[in-house]
Structures are given as C-alpha cells and as structure tokens.
C-alpha cells in the first residue's frame, strides 16, 4: 500500500506567523489575510495597514512599513521569480489606483515585502541590471531593495534570527531537531488566541 504524504498548508501558517511576529504592536496594525484586490479572483497574500500614521513599527521586519504594506509569501517548496516580482508590483500599483478619489493613496505610502525560503538570485540580478535597483542587507535575513518609488524588502525565512523572528523563521521543512521542536511547543504552550491556534500545523 502506497504511503500518502500529508500536504502542509503553508499559507495559513504564514498568516499566523506574520501576525505573531508583530504581537507586541498589534494595536498599531490591521491584518487582512488574502486581501481581495478586486471582484475578480486577484488577491495578495497579506495586507498590513498601519492604524496610526504617526506611530513607527519597531519590529525588525516592519521598520520599513508605511501606511499600506503588501506582503507576498512563498512556501519552502516555492521560489520567488522575476514574474512574481512584476505580478506583486502590479498588484501594488493596482491597489494604489483602485480608490474612490484620484491619488487617495500616495505611492510612498505603499511598501512591498517578499517572504521566501530561498534567496532569489536571478530575480535580484534582473532588478540590478534592468531596473538599476540596489540591494543591501539590513539585518539577518532582511534585505532592502532601494531605488524604486515603492519601498521594498526581501525576507529570507531560513536566515532570520530565531530570537527575533521565531515564527517566520520556523516556516521551514527542516524543523526536526528535538530541541527546536520542544522550544516551539513550549513557546506555543498557554497561547489561546486564535492566531496561535492556527499554528498547530507543527
């Protein structure tokens, strides 16, 4: 009898993880998983809106945030491609333009965050060569892509500091070590909010 492999639903785990990462600043942010961009089936993985414009987000992965923050997540099996960049960039332009009033959302109020497990070398080389964008490492697993109207960052989950970004950093297929799993379970223990409950994928 052939063994069936259980498929891990990575996106619900990501949606829970991204919210937990900002748990100390929830009052500043509004999370909208799978935010629909239009009546047609076009959606972004996560839209994070700053509740108060004058409050800065202190979390390391949110320091780049402005008012409207568009997040694209790739599962550990997936890769971030050049097409993905332009798709999400197009979504960001659409989100900025799809308003009641002209210029209701200013481009500088929109940021783009790409989250993936593998460093997208081909995509980065393309952006450097054809769009003259620059990339620099801001912190462990955090890269800023500069030179565009939209502030853009790239998060490589396996490179993130587990002390600062435990939940996103744990979105990997190789979380197998006994100590690591025990630590995650201990951290999870006693959390009864819905966001933590969704992380029972582990």
State where each predicted segment sits.
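Elongated, amphipathic alpha-helical interaction scaffolds
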Residues: 1-202
């Amino acid at each position: 009898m052939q063994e069936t492999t259980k498929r891990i639903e990575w996106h619900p785990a990501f949606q829970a993880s991204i919210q937990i990462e900002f748990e100390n600043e929830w009052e500043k942010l509004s999370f909208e998983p799978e935010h629909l961009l239009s009546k047609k089936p076009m959606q972004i993985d996560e839209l994070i809106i700053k509740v108060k414009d004058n409050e800065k987000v202190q979390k390391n992965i949110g320091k780049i945030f402005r008012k409207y923050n568009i997040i694209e997540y790739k599962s550990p099996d997936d890769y971030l491609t050049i097409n993905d960049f332009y798709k999400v960039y197009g979504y960001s332009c659409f989100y900025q333009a799809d308003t009641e009033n002209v210029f209701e959302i200013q481009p500088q109020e929109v940021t783009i965050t790409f989250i993936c497990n593998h460093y997208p070398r081909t995509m980065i080389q393309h952006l450097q060569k054809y769009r003259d964008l620059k990339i620099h490492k801001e912190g462990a697993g955090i890269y800023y892509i500069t030179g565009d109207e939209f502030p853009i960052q790239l998060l490589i989950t396996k490179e993130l500091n587990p002390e600062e970004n435990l939940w996103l950093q744990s979105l990997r297929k190789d979380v197998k070590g006994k100590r690591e799993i025990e630590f995650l379970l201990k951290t999870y223990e006693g959390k009864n909010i819905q966001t933590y409950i969704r992380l029972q994928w582990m």
